Amino acid sequence: MKQTILDLMRMSRICRMVLATCLGSFILVIFYFQSMFQPVMRRNPFAAEGCCRKGSRNALQELYNPTQAEFSAAAVLHQARRDQVAETCRAHSASSRKRRVLTPSDLKHLVVDEDHELIYCYVPKVACTNWKRVMMVLSGRGKYSNPMEIPSNEAHVPSNLKTLNQYSIPDINHRLKNYLKFLFVREPFERLVSAYRNKFTLRYNTSFHKRYGTKIVRRYRKNATTEALQSGADVKFQEFAEYLVDPGTQREAPLNEHWQTVYSLCHPCHIHYDLVGKYETLEDDANYVLKLVGEGDSLRFPSFAKSTRTTDQMAAMFFGNISSQQQSQLYQLYKLDYLMFNYSIPSYLKLQ
């Protein structure tokens, strides 16, 4: 009899735990179904709520209802970018919303700065190292006041920045609703070629050579040498392209973040981003964000080495080495990024 009562008590506790988990997930489901179909906001939606601390509230007000003349042109530009994202999501709802609901694990790319109530979705190969440096300075999660004093490897240490997936579901919902959210994007094929050059043509990236290079050589290179199979250090762009468009690649695991699509990393059809910056106008857009949060006088976004960056001409050279079929397949893979962020189809593509 006692054993039966104990068993019933255990079952009751388990049921309560399951119910609590389901309720939390249901709350997250509600938030995302509400946010997925909300109209594009043209005015600051938070001005009357008194929800935000000084930095973020002023940032949102200036973004949606600029009072300073220098912000007026930027406000029009960023409204057009928001509209482009929303229009693409509506027009391609079947493909852009394959995932109807997000979970906390989908939010690991969203970096949170509590002091300024900012959320930044980082996209590798779009100045994300410098943005992580800036976010470390803004959030005070480090000993530095100058972003360029932060070693690049330290900027990528997970514990140096807090990401949205570390919060409870109610706290996630609160921040997604009330914080200024932004991301930076880049011409998709320039970003792809930049990732290839960085991860497969530099000797020091042995971890990528071992994890991905050996797999690519084994699958797509005929008569590969023993050395190539063991090191994976000499992957050709054609082999990399073949790996990306192979249906089996995405079935086995999500793409690596360095060549994953922006819409899969940041979920712009599920999360309303207030500001979309572009790599092509990086310094202007980045410093605009810093001005919005009241840090424009004390902090400037680091400039980058233009001599080593991947250009359109460089991307054209790499794409000239792959077939028109592979070019078409790659375009289909990154098509939503092209459409959402208003990038033209590259003139060098030979689409079938």
Swiss-Prot record:
Entries under InterPro entries matching the protein: Carb_sulfotrans_8-10, Sulfotransferase
Cytoplasmic side: 1-16
Localization (cell): Golgi apparatus membrane
Statement: the UniProt record of this protein carries the keyword Transmembrane helix: yes
Glycosylation sites: N205, N223, N321, N342
Side of membrane Lumenal, spans: 38-352
GO MF: chondroitin 4-sulfotransferase activity; sulfotransferase activity
Catalytic activity, reaction form: chondroitin beta-D-glucuronate + n 3'-phosphoadenylyl sulfate = chondroitin 4'-sulfate + n adenosine 3',5'-bisphosphate + n H(+)
Enzyme class: transferase
Keywords tagged on the record: Carbohydrate metabolism, Glycoprotein, Golgi apparatus, Membrane, Signal-anchor, Transferase, Transmembrane, Transmembrane helix
The protein's Enzyme Commission number: 2.8.2.5
Alphabetized Pfam families for the sequence: Sulfotransfer_2
Residue numbers binding 3'-phosphoadenylyl sulfate: 124-130, 186-194
Location, primary (coarse class): Golgi
Cellular component aspect of the GO annotation: Golgi membrane
Membrane topology: Single-pass type II membrane protein
GO terms, biological process: carbohydrate biosynthetic process; chondroitin sulfate proteoglycan biosynthetic process; motor neuron axon guidance; muscle organ development; proteoglycan biosynthetic process
Highest rank taxon of the organism: Eukaryota
Sequence intervals crossing the membrane: 17-37
PANTHER family: CARBOHYDRATE SULFOTRANSFERASE, CARBOHYDRATE SULFOTRANSFERASE 11
Similarity field: Belongs to the sulfotransferase 2 family.
Function: Catalyzes the transfer of sulfate to position 4 of the N-acetylgalactosamine (GalNAc) residue of chondroitin.
Protein name: Carbohydrate sulfotransferase 11
